[in-house]
Amino acid sequence: VARTYLLLAWTWLRASAQYPVPLVMMVLGSFVLTGMDVAAIWIVFGHTRSLGGFALAEVMFLYGTAGVSFGLADLLFGNVDRLSQHIRAGTFDAMLIRPASAFVQVATDRFSVQRFGRLAQAAVVLAVALPRLDPPWSRIWMVPVMIVCGVVIFASIFTIGGAMQFLLTDAPEVSNAFTYGGSTLTQYPLTVYGGDLVRAVTFIVPLAFVNWQPALYVLDRDDPFGLPYGLRFAAPAAALVLALAAALAWRAGIRRYRSTGS
């Protein structure tokens, strides 16, 4: 499956590389556009010393980890969000009869290099924030773990959103609230939101495990909401459970799918 994914993605990358100037402009445009979010945070800190009790470097750390996780998930699996377009056009039927995973084909269709810009911008922010925080080496190991778990969580939400489109062809708007909306939510300390929302993204849609709970461990901060200390280490379990749910949802969608006949 991984080999097929890389082959199909490379095919689209080669096609995009035929037009290098537009390609570079799209990547730079994405980099600059997402950079406006960072500018907004800087503006906020121009008027206050903390946001939800967190300093600038800590907020940038949250922003960077959320951005890298979402950027990788969006780059690798964001196209699953376009499943309804394939269903309406009838191209999904063709994918089902090809000797390759339908999921991989949907994920790599029109593999977008533009998304590299978002990922690169978040990586730069994270690279700048980490040295300013200077966390102890005994805690730094959590950073790659939280990024990997964040990728799995966002990819699973993309997949569940795609599976919903087998039943509701207008489901992308719903899934976007949890993918792109979830990305925006996790860029900031959860202390700026209400307690009910925090509990929802901890125990229902586990967005708090993208970076919030692991970050509390890295930053050696108490949980402002008084949740158990063990949740700081629960990101792998949350990612695994959501990934299994996504796999089951996708398989159920495939079984229920009926050709549009187009």
Residue spans of the language-model regions?
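Hydrophobic transmembrane alpha-helices and immediately adjacent juxtamembrane helices
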Residues: 1-262
